[in-house]
Amino acid sequence: MKKNWTKILTITLEIIIIIIASFLVIRNVCYTAIIVNQSSMNPTLNDGDYGYAIKTKHALNNIKRFDIVIFELEENNEKKDLIKRIIGLPNEEIEFKDDSDLYVNNVLIEQDFIDKETQKLTNIGLKQKKFIVPENQYFVLGDNRGISYDSRNFGYIEQNSIFGILKIITKHYSNYNNETNKYEKEEFISFKFF
């Protein structure tokens, strides 16, 4: 009888180890964890939000308009990771009219995901209002248009610089006490799927 329990326990532990190992392999091969540390994607993403981005070759070869992507930007011999929304696909014409209306191939694009207050493009030094996206490149914008550093500033991003498409985000809220310099309460309120 004792041998049976030992055998059952051994098999159960082996199954648990296989499940955990499979989960870790899938997570590391297919997904990358992210922490948002910028406000250029407000109100969709906030500083401190956690998420997972898919990084499979199939997903990265099927990028669609409005996908939120994580990519590497190299400027002045420095590399940094940014999170932005895909607006223009290869070979499309992007145009800003009246400082806030966004047109793709002469069609007005509805942007329900941005705050109307941040939609205005004034005071950001926009030198160019019309863009033609080259082959294998994308035009990206932050949802917080008034402060976002994006394709309006650094130009198009190469397809091969994109290493993830955001799929899950956990909205993170915390109360910071300025007197104690500590977070008093942290809550993970909701999940958002893209």
What label would you give each PLM region?
Residues 30-47:
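Alpha-helical transmembrane signal-anchor/signal-peptide segments
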Residues 24, 37-38, 153:
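Alpha-helical transmembrane segments and their juxtamembrane interfaces
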Residues 25-29, 34, 76:
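Short N-terminal signal/transit or membrane-insertion segments
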Residues 10-29:
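Hydrophobic membrane-insertion alpha-helices, especially the h-region
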Residues 2-9, 14, 43, 47-194:
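Soluble "head" domains of membrane/secretory-pathway proteins
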